[in-house]
Amino acid sequence: MGMRMMFTVFLLVVLATTVVSFTSDRASDGRKAAASDLITLTIKGCCSDPPCIANNPDLCGRRR
């Protein structure tokens, strides 16, 4: 293989790696957002339940 051909293969490998990395990162962001939403909903549910508020005052912004 000539130098030009090796350089072309190198560029293709770098491009493919970048595309895979970028796509994986975007998918990961979506999972993080979904987990964050679930945590928020769980905390809101706790903050509307008096026994849960009593057991976890720090979650709802209240101190003992």
Curated annotation (Swiss-Prot):
<feature type="disulfide bond">
    <location>
        <begin position="47"/>
        <end position="60"/>
    </location>
</feature>
<protein>
    <recommendedName>
        <fullName>Conotoxin Vc1.3</fullName>
    </recommendedName>
</protein>
<feature type="disulfide bond">
    <location>
        <begin position="46"/>
        <end position="52"/>
    </location>
</feature>
<feature type="propeptide">
    <location>
        <begin position="22"/>
        <end position="43"/>
    </location>
</feature>
<dbReference type="GO" id="GO:0005576">
    <property type="term" value="C:extracellular region"/>
</dbReference>
<feature type="signal peptide">
    <location>
        <begin position="1"/>
        <end position="21"/>
    </location>
</feature>
<keyword id="KW-0800">Toxin</keyword>
<dbReference type="GO" id="GO:0030550">
    <property type="term" value="F:acetylcholine receptor inhibitor activity"/>
</dbReference>
<dbReference type="InterPro" id="IPR009958">
    <property type="entry name" value="Conotoxin_a-typ"/>
</dbReference>
<keyword id="KW-1015">Disulfide bond</keyword>
<keyword id="KW-0027">Amidation</keyword>
<dbReference type="Pfam" id="PF07365">
    <property type="entry name" value="Toxin_8"/>
</dbReference>
<feature type="modified residue" description="Cysteine amide">
    <location>
        <position position="60"/>
    </location>
</feature>
<dbReference type="GO" id="GO:0090729">
    <property type="term" value="F:toxin activity"/>
</dbReference>
<comment type="similarity">
    <text>Belongs to the conotoxin A superfamily.</text>
</comment>
<keyword id="KW-0732">Signal</keyword>
<comment type="function">
    <text>May act as a toxin.</text>
</comment>
<keyword id="KW-0964">Secreted</keyword>
